[in-house]
Each structure stands twice: as structure tokens, then as C-alpha cells.
């Protein structure tokens, strides 16, 4: 899990050197997008696979795919090969994300999972901090290719440990004939879901950046995505027995609330993570590495909130209060970020980040816990895959939205400023443009840029506030499984009866 989390951030500081070597400035966006497209599109599919095949061997195959694609990316002779390697890497990452949380479900008792998930949350925070530092170190002192090669020895050790020590009983369906498993894989749904998700993400990546939103390519992609995803939903309803996302899962109150909370938390969070460093670089004149250091208060407080939240959850049992408190703190922290001025001091931007980070640490693991506590064990892999899908989708949608809002606001606010070339802003050169302006004009442009970024933070505030609704809608279940109450994990009979009834109907 650490390798996959690290892989998302380690490349950031290496990209300039990669573009210099491959002369591929126009391909920069695809180094991240190719990974995101396959990882997001296949997340729900892996949730289904883990319910049918051996958890241990599916995870091992996923790591092997991740390792092979890392080797391909590291040895890439050109930009195209690197993009292909990143796309295959996303396939392995999708399997690893789902596999690790499924292993936790099988190995760790429910009442101890909050602490484990808190540790994983801390791991994600640490990877966000050290990833760019490691990537910069490899790029400066060895070669950017070691950003990928580092996965090989570490992943090899992980595979060996899993092979020898991980003991997970096979699913009942693991012994079924391969032909029967393939029938259960929801081929019609997969054929609709994967291209539908890819079309949606491509439209969001291209819209307003590569092409205007009115461009025929973007409109066609959005239309096709809508048709395919509606078709996928219809298949899930009409063929529930083999559905990738059975309707009974989405009808469960806590799962629906958790999905909403996950989506909205990540929509707002990725706005902060992506645009806060831009504020430091453009408004405060920080370098790329300095802006990373200045976001440490957010990352460290998130790690602290995640660990303390997991410990507290284990003691009190109930996770809903943590979700409510956490999302409320996020709202306050995000709201304060929208008050940034050009001369905002360190005390404020550090304090605002700490407030937001603590809330994020308390809240962002709760949807996964709610899913595990609310679903029968056989449905947990699918439920967790849904949460991961919502995470990736939220990140994609709102980073794209934020980029468009920033570009539009900059054009609107700087169009009348003398000496400002609007074409440089729309091509992504606003920060360097500010530094080249005369002092008098620069002050005006700086205020305009700050106002534009505040608008972006306001965009992130909307889903952050909406996440409180998802947190409040969660059922009050305890991970301690109080005596006399049957937990969702022990409700296998109920689910089997539902499956039996569904089979008879079909």
C-alpha cells in the first residue's frame, strides 16, 4: 500500500527532467492521467474479482502487474512507452488498493480495524510528504528512472512475505469452475462500466484545458459516458445475481451515506491539496520545494488526526461522531482558507491547515469502517471498492473543475490590466507572468490572482460542507459488536436468502 501511495506523489518532482529527456512537454498530463484512468475504471471490477477468486493470489497477481509496469516505466525509451507503463501500473494499483483492505477484513477483527485504518491513513499522509522528496533525490543524484525501479525490490519483498505468511481462507466461490466464475464476473456490466468511466475521466481531463467545453470531442465523450453509465446501472438492476454493484449494497443506508461522504470529502480535499501549493508559489513567491514544506502542517495534522481517530474509535466503538466532528472541522478549516489575502501571515495559514488536517484525519477513514460494519462479509470487498472508486472519481472531477475556475477567474480579473498578456495566463504561465510584471502592475495582478484562488477554495468548500450530510446520515453502529446484537458481518444467512430469492426470480 505504501508503494502505491508513494507512486502517486514521487513523480511530481521528476516530471521536468522527464520532459527534458523525452522532449515531451505536451505529454505531461498523461503521465498522471493514464494511471488514474485505469485505476479508477477497474476499481469496481476488482471488488467483484475479490469476491470470486482467492484473495491471496489475486493480490499477488496485482502486485506482479504493478512491479512489471514499474520496470516498463523505468526502462521506457520514449514518452509513449512511459504512458503505457503508467496505464498498466494503474491496473495493478487498482488490485492492490482493493486487495489490501480486503485482507484487513479477513485478518483483523472489526473492533481492531479503526486502529489499523488509522495507521493506513497515516501511511498515506507520510507518502504525500516523502514522495516528492524521494523523487527529487533520485532525479537530482541518480536518475528519474529510479522513481520506478525502487518499487521492484520493495515489492518483491512484499510478495514473498504475503506468499509465506498471509493465511486467508478461500472464498466459497474460489473452488467453483472457472467457467462459472467468468459468468459471475458481470461481463455486460464491465463492458459498459470501463469505457463509460474512461470517457467521463477523459472529458474531465480535456474539458476547459486541452479543448474548450464546447468542443465536439468533449461533448461526445460526456454524452457517451452518460449513455454507457446509465446502461451499466440498468444492467445492475436487471441482473442483480451477477451484478458488479448489486442494488442491495447501494440500498443499505450506511453504504449510501458513506459513498456520499467519501465522494464529497475527496472532492474538497483534492482542491486543497492541489491548489494550496499554487497559492504559496504564486502569492508568497515560494519555490516548488518550499511550497511543499509549507503544506506540512496539513499533512502532519492529518496523520495525527488519523492515528488519534483510530485509537479513539477503538475505545468508544462508534465511528459516526468522529465523522461528524471531522467533517465540521474540515468545513471550518476550508472556510478559513477562502479568507486568504496577499499579506496573510504564517500564523493564520499554519493554523487553518492544522484545523482542516485534523478534521480530515478524523473523518476520511470512517466511510470504509461504516461499510465494513454495515455489510455482510461477502459484500465487503464490493463495498470497499465502491469507496475507492468514489475517492478517485471525486479527485478527478474537482481538480478539473478547480483548474477551469482558476483559468476563467484569472482571465476575468486580469483582462483589463495593462501589460498583462491573457494568452500566457490561459496557457498556464500565470505564475511566471506575475514575476515578470513591473511592480505597480504586479501588485494589481497579485491581488487578482489571490481572489481567483479564493474562488477555487470556495468551489472546494461546497462539497466539503455537503460531506457533513453524509456523515450525519451514517447509522450509529459500534465496531465492538455489543452482546445481543447481530452485526452485519454475521448476517450471512440474510444475504444468502436474498441471493436465493433473486436466483429463483431470475
Swiss-Prot record:
Gene3D superfamilies: MFS general substrate transporter like domains (1.20.1250.20), Multidrug resistance protein D (1.20.1720.10). One of its GO terms (molecular function) is transmembrane transporter activity. GO terms for cellular component: plasma membrane. It holds the Pfam family MFS_1. Keywords: Glycoprotein, Membrane, Transmembrane, Transmembrane helix, Transport. Its main location: membrane. It is found in: Membrane. Residues 487-506 have a biased composition (Basic and acidic residues). Residues 481-506 are annotated as: Disordered. It is a multi-pass membrane protein. The chain crosses the membrane at residues 22-42, 45-65, 88-108, 118-138, 146-166, 187-207, 218-238, 260-280, 292-312, 322-342, 349-369, 380-400, 456-476. It comes from the Eukaryota. Disulfide bonds: none annotated. Glycans are attached at residues 78, 141. MFS-type transporter; part of the gene cluster that mediates the biosynthesis of the tetrahydroxanthone dimer neosartorin, which exhibits antibacterial activity. Belongs to the major facilitator superfamily. TCR/Tet family. PANTHER family: AFLATOXIN EFFLUX PUMP, PUTATIVE-RELATED, MAJOR FACILITATOR SUPERFAMILY. This is MFS-type transporter nsrN. It comes from Aspergillus novofumigatus (strain IBT 16806).
Amino acid at each position: 500500500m505504501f508503494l502505491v501511495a508513494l507512486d502517486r506523489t514521487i513523480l511530481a518532482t521528476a516530471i521536468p527532467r522527464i520532459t527534458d529527456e523525452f522532449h515531451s512537454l505536451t505529454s505531461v498530463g498523461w503521465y498522471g492521467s493514464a494511471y488514474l484512468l485505469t485505476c479508477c475504471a477497474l476499481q469496481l471490477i476488482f471488488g467483484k474479482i475479490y469476491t470470486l477468486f482467492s484473495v491471496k493470489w489475486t493480490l499477488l497477481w496485482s502486485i506482479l502487474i504493478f512491479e512489471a509496469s514499474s520496470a516498463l516505466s523505468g526502462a521506457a525509451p520514449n514518452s509513449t512507452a512511459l504512458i503505457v507503463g503508467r496505464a498498466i501500473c494503474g491496473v495493478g494499483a487498482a488490485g492492490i488498493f482493493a486487495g489490501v483492505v480486503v485482507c484487513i477484513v479477513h485478518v483483523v477483527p472489526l473492533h481492531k480495524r479503526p486502529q489499523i485504518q488509522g495507521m493506513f491513513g497515516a501511511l498515506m499522509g507520510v507518502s504525500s510528504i516523502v514522495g516528492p522528496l524521494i523523487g527529487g533525490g533520485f532525479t537530482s543524484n541518480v536518475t528519474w528512472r529510479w522513481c520506478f525501479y525502487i518499487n521492484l525490490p520493495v515489492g518483491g519483498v512484499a510478495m514473498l512475505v504475503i506468499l509465506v505468511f498471509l493465511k486467508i481462507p478461500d472464498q466459497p466461490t474460489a473452488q467453483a469452475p472457472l467457467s462459472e466464475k467468468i459468468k459471475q464476473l458481470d461481463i455486460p456490466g464491465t463492458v459498459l462500466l470501463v469505457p463509460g468511466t474512461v470517457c467521463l475521466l477523459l472529458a474531465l481531463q480535456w474539458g476547459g484545458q486541452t479543448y474548450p467545453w464546447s468542443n465536439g470531442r468533449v461533448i461526445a465523450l460526456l454524452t457517451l459516458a452518460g449513455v454507457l453509465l446509465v446502461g451499466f446501472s440498468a444492467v445492475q438492476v436487471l441482473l442483480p445475481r451477477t451484478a458488479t454493484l448489486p442494488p442491495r449494497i447501494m440500498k443499505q443506508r450506511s453504504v449510501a451515506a458513506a459513498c456520499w461522504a467519501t465522494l464529497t470529502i475527496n472532492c474538497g480535499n483534492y482542491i486543497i491539496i492541489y491548489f494550496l501549493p499554487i497559492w504559496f508559489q504564486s502569492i508568497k513567491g515560494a519555490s516548488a520545494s518550499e511550497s511543499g514544506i509549507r503544506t506540512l502542517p496539513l499533512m502532519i495534522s492529518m496523520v495525527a488526526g488519523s492515528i488519534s481517530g483510530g485509537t479513539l474509535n477503538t475505545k468508544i466503538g462508534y465511528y459516526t461522531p468522529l465523522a461528524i466532528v471531522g467533517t465540521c472541522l474540515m468545513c471550518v478549516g476550508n472556510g478559513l482558507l477562502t479568507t486568504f489575502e496577499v499579506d496573510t501571515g504564517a500564523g493564520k495559514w499554519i493554523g487553518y491547515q492544522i484545523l482542516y488536517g485534523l478534521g480530515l484525519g478524523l473523518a476520511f477513514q470512517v466511510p470504509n469502517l461504516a461499510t465494513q460494519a454495515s455489510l455482510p462479509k461477502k459484500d465487503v470487498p464490493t463495498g470497499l471498492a465502491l469507496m475507492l472508486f468514489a475517492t478517485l472519481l471525486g479527485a478527478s472531477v474537482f481538480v478539473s473543475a478547480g483548474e477551469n475556475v482558476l483559468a476563467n477567474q484569472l482571465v476575468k480579473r486580469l483582462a483589463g490590466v495593462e501589460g498583462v498578456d491573457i494568452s500566457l495566463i490561459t496557457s498556464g504561465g500565470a505564475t511566471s507572468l506575475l514575476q515578470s510584471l513591473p511592480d505597480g502592475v504586479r501588485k494589481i495582478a497579485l491581488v487578482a490572482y489571490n481572489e481567483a484562488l479564493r474562488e477555487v477554495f470556495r468551489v472546494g468548500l461546497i462539497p466539503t460542507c455537503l460531506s457533513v450530510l453524509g456523515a450525519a446520515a451514517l447509522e450509529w453502529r459500534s465496531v465492538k459488536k455489543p452482546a445481543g446484537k447481530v452485526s452485519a458481518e454475521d448476517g450471512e444467512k440474510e444475504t444468502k436468502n436474498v441471493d436465493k430469492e433473486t436466483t429463483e426470480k431470475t
